[in-house]
Design a protein with these regions (language model features):
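Edge beta-strands of jelly-roll/beta-sandwich modules across compartments, strongly enriched
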Residues: 141-152
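Bacterial N-terminal signal peptides that target proteins for export
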Residues: 1-9
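Short tyrosine-centred short linear motifs in exposed loops/low-complexity segments
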Residues: 53-57, 117-131, 135-137
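Short beta-strand-plus-loop segments that form exposed binding edges in beta-rich domains
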Residues: 62-64, 135-140
Length: 156
């Protein structure tokens, strides 16, 4: 009996630890892993989301780079399109990833540099409908080398 109780607690602890560090599906707006860490210029990362009632998003982006990434910064455009295909919100971003000497601004972990970057705090979509969330990379050379994964998250 004692052994069964101990096993139950060990199993419960393992399941809790496995769940830590992973995003729940309802927090992920869009996600893409890049084959061979290459991202073509007009290969948009997007996802359609059905909005049923007024919703507020607190958006951030987790993006991972490899040593092959050639730039000190990352430029992108984040756009939300309404159900008619019209831009609802759009903004260009430029994030500094490395210092002037080319050293990363974050420690390397699991063979990549992973940044969590603020995108849009308190984005409110009032009208119901199908909306498309899109991220477009704006770096000058294509394909962009060294991007491993991108995740747009709702932190609410």
């Amino acid at each position: 009996m004692k052994r069964t109780g101990f096993g139950f607690w060990v199993l419960t602890l393992c399941l809790c630890l496995l769940g830590c560090g992973h995003l729940s599906k309802d927090k992920v707006i869009l996600q893409r892993s890049f084959y061979n860490t290459l991202w073509e210029r007009f290969d948009y990362v997007n996802n359609d989301i059905e909005i049923m009632a007024s919703t507020t998003y607190d958006l951030s982006m987790r993006i991972s780079f490899t040593d092959d990434y050639p730039y000190n910064d990352f430029s992108m455009i984040f756009t939300v399109f309404d159900d008619k295909g019209n831009p609802y919100r759009s903004k260009a971003y430029k994030f500094n990833l490395k210092d002037e000497e080319g050293h990363w601004n974050i420690e390397k972990k699991d063979d990549c540099y992973t940044f969590t970057l603020p995108i849009n705090k308190q984005l409110t979509i009032s009208d119901p409908g199908k909306y498309q969330f899109r991220i477009e990379q704006k770096q000058p050379i294509t394909p962009l080398v060294g991007v491993k994964e991108l995740v747009l998250m709702n932190d609410n």
